[in-house]
Amino acid sequence: MIWVVLMMAILLPQSLAHPGFFTSIGQMTDLIHNEKDLVTSLKDYIKAEEDKLEQIKKWAEKLDRLTSTATKDPEGFVGHPVNAFKLMKRLNTEWSELENLILKDMSDGFISNLTIQRQYFPNDEDQVGAAKALFRLQDTYNLDTNTISKGNLPGVQHKSFLTAEDCFELGKVAYTEADYYHTELWMEQALTQLEEGELSTVDKVSVLDYLSYAVYQQGDLDKALLLTKKLLELDPEHQRANGNLVYFEYIMSKEKDANKSASGDQSDQKTAPKKKGIAVDYLPERQKYEMLCRGEGIKMTPRRQKRLFCRYHDGNRNPKFILAPAKQEDEWDKPRIIRFHDIISDAEIEIVKDLAKPRLRRATISNPVTGALETVHYRISKSAWLSGYEDPVVSRINMRIQDLTGLDVSTAEELQVANYGVGGQYEPHFDFARKDEPDAFRELGTGNRIATWLFYMSDVSAGGATVFPEVGASVWPKKGTAVFWYNLFASGEGDYSTRHAACPVLVGNKWVSNKWLHERGQEFRRPCTLSELE
C-alpha cells in the first residue's frame, strides 16, 4: 500500500501544485480525474469495511447458534471432551483474533491517499474565485439567480442544479466581500427554494439574518424591517434581529420626522423634468462592454458592411500560399480586423496545448507605474509562453504569421497560450504601451507592440467573445481561426480604437494563443508615414 501511495505522489500532475484552479478550465479537468481516483479509493475502503463486517457477522451467527445449544444443558455440553477443548480454544485464541479483526483500521490506505491528494486540492481562494465568477457571469449576461440555480444556461451539455445550501454559500461569499447586491440576490434565491419545500441543512432564520442586513446596507429600510419581522416570527428570541428591529424602527421614525419638516415647501416647487435616455454611443465603457458580450452591440451600417469582403490571401505572392491561399474575412473596418479561417489545424492545436499545460500560470499584467508583473481581478486566465525553439510546430506557426502579415516575427514576443477559467475574462485594455508608459517594453528593446495576432484554439459554447468597446465590434471564437489587427498607426502612434476585451466564458472551455509583434524589424515592411493617424 505504501508503494502505491508513493507512486501516486510521483504521478500526480505537477501543474496542480500551483494555486488558482478557478482561472483555468484546463487545469480544473485534472481535478475531475483526481476526484474520480479518490472515489475509487473510497469505494475500495467501503468494500474492505463490508468484507470485515461480513466476517464478524458470520462469526456472531456461528457463536449464536453454538451458545444457544450450550446454554440449554451447560454441564452436558462441556462434558463432551471435544466441546470442552473447543471452548478453551475459542476463548483463548479465537476471541483474540476477532478482537484484532474488529480493531483493524481498514481506512489506512484511503486516508493516506486522501492526505497526499489534499495538498493539491483547491483552496479558499479558488472557491471564492469561482463564486465571484458566477456573479460576473450573472451581471454580464443578465442572468437571474433562478436561471443559474436551475442550470438553464445556453449551450450546456451537463445540466447542474444549485441547492439552497449552495445559494446560501454564494450569498455568504458576497457578504464577506461586502457585495450586498449579490448577497441579496442569492439569499433571496436560497429563501425561495426553502419556501418551496427543499430539504436543506440551512434554515430560514440564517438566510433571513444575512438577507435583512444586506437589504439594509443598500438603503431599503422598509424591506429590511419586513424581513427582520419575518425572522422574529420564526425565532422570537433571536438577539441580533431584536436589536436590528429596534434600530430600524428608530431610523425610520427619524426619517419620517425629517420628511415632515422638509415637506412644507415642496408643493410650491416645480417637478424637475426627467432626463432623456442616454444614447448607446455615450454609455459608460463597462455597460458597452457587457452589451457587446451579449451580442447587443452597435450594429454596423449597411453602407459600411458593403466594404467588408472575404478573399483568398497569398501573402503577397508567398510561394507557400500561391497554390493554397489563406481564407481571409474582414470582421471590421476601423480599426481593420481581419479573420483568417482554417489557419491552424486540430493537430497543431493539441500540440500547442500539450506544450503549454504543464507550465500554465495565473496570467499577469504589467503595472503601468512600476512595470512589475502582477495578477489582477479583471484578468481571469492562466497562460504559458512557448518559444519557436521548443518544437517545430511552434516555429512553423510563427513563420505562418510572418508569411501572412508580412511582418518580421524575430522581434516578436514568444507565443502566449491562454486558457480561461470559470467566468474567464480580460476586461478592456490596450495591447500597446501608451505615452505615459515609456518603460513598458524597454527591457525587450524591440519598441512598442505594432500588431496583435490571436488564434482561437477552441469553440466556446456560450460567451467568450473578443470585443472592442470603442467601436462596437464583437468577434466570436471559432476553432481553427485567427484574427489580426494593428495596434499602432503607420506613424507609430497608438490606435486607441483597438482597446479590446475578452468577454467572460459563460459555458465551455476557451483556449487561445497570441503573438504580439513589435516595431523593430518592420521599418521596410511597414514604412512609417508623416501623418499621425495614418
UniProtKB/Swiss-Prot annotation:
Pfam families recorded: 2OG-FeII_Oxy_3 (PF13640), P4Ha_N (PF08336), TPR_P4H (PF23558)
SUPFAM superfamilies in alphabetical order: TPR-like (SSF48452)
Residue stretches of each TPR repeat: 205-238
GO cellular component, one term: procollagen-proline 4-dioxygenase complex
Record bears the keyword Ion transport: no
Binding annotation for Fe cation: 429, 431, 500
Cofactor note: Binds 1 Fe(2+) ion per subunit.
Any Gene Ontology biological process: collagen fibril organization
Domain Fe2OG dioxygenase: from-to ranges: 411-519
Binding positions for 2-oxoglutarate per the UniProt entry: 510
PROSITE patterns, per the entry: FE2OG_OXY, TPR, TPR_REGION
Glycosylation sites: 113, 259
Catalyzed reactions per annotation: L-prolyl-[collagen] + 2-oxoglutarate + O2 = trans-4-hydroxy-L-prolyl-[collagen] + succinate + CO2
InterPro entries: Oxoglu/Fe-dep_dioxygenase_dom, P4HA-like, Pro_4_hyd_alph, Pro_4_hyd_alph_FE2OG_OXY, Pro_4_hyd_alph_N, TPR-like_helical_dom_sf, TPR_rpt
MF terms in GO: identical protein binding; iron ion binding; L-ascorbic acid binding; procollagen-proline 4-dioxygenase activity
UniProt tissue specificity: Expressed at least in brain, heart and lung.
Gene3D superfamilies: 6.10.140.1460, q2cbj1_9rhob like domain (2.60.120.620), Tetratricopeptide repeat domain (1.25.40.10)
Record text on subunit structure and interactions: Heterotetramer of two alpha-1 chains and two beta chains (P4HB)(the beta chain is the multi-functional PDI), where P4HB plays the role of a structural subunit; this tetramer catalyzes the formation of 4-hydroxyproline in collagen.
Family: Belongs to the P4HA family.
Protein name, as recorded: Prolyl 4-hydroxylase subunit alpha-1
Organism: Mus musculus
Gene: P4ha1
